[in-house]
């Protein structure tokens, strides 16, 4: 109930602000309302509206540190780094324990490709913040910029210890494990993560991908299936489960998974081609050819589709038709 009230207040502030712009009447908003409005427009990619809101906000609240930090964030985004840095130094003189000042300073150094200094500043922010997850995530990104995958991995792990639901950190930690050729260790990490967060479809999906890479197709299928039980519209998990099932020669189950991807979204030439290949393995030539034709209809430029039809006719010893289709593949 509390959350819905907050959302209602937020939507009311936004509609009130947009109504003000249309009527040219100047209405009062508190500084936090303005911050939310500005950040909303930035998230929506509406920079001009964000700038209008910021101008009005600073006219009404010229001493608001929060609004000045939003202004600095926008200056950094526009690569006006020197102006942003000057403003940060002025704010630091007033509020030396504000962690956002250190985070924005780190952002400036990061933009200047001085990632070591950015990490130093973020380490200082850690001593002041209550939002450890966000800062650890930022530190992880700086280490990625420096190609220090080991330290990046440790930072993302710390981020997930603080906020187990941080999906970007989860993807990033798996990326680091993979880049470091630590696929077995990645699976062990994900198993522990899943023990704490068993309904994370992303963790199950990533686990499946890693098992697939290690050619452990049985465990890959198990992981992908858990991902699809949790999220019945997880297109990627159905697609990759189809691939793993093919490896196990479970062609009917693979077809079912590929067909699910077509139900969930527009058909892809890849899924149609794989369905055709599975039917061919099952000896169902009519369905195989039907799906190969659907493949080239969906993507006439996909040479693999034309080659599949060519191979099909070669196996039928119908070389005349095979020649027609091989020419389309070239």
Predicted ranges, named:
Residues 57, 90-91, 124-125, 158-159, ...:
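Canonical positions in the second alpha-helix
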Residues 43, 77, 111-112, 145, ...:
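Register position in tetratricopeptide repeats
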Residues 60, 93-95, 128-129, 162-163, ...:
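Structural marker of alpha-solenoid helical repeat scaffolds
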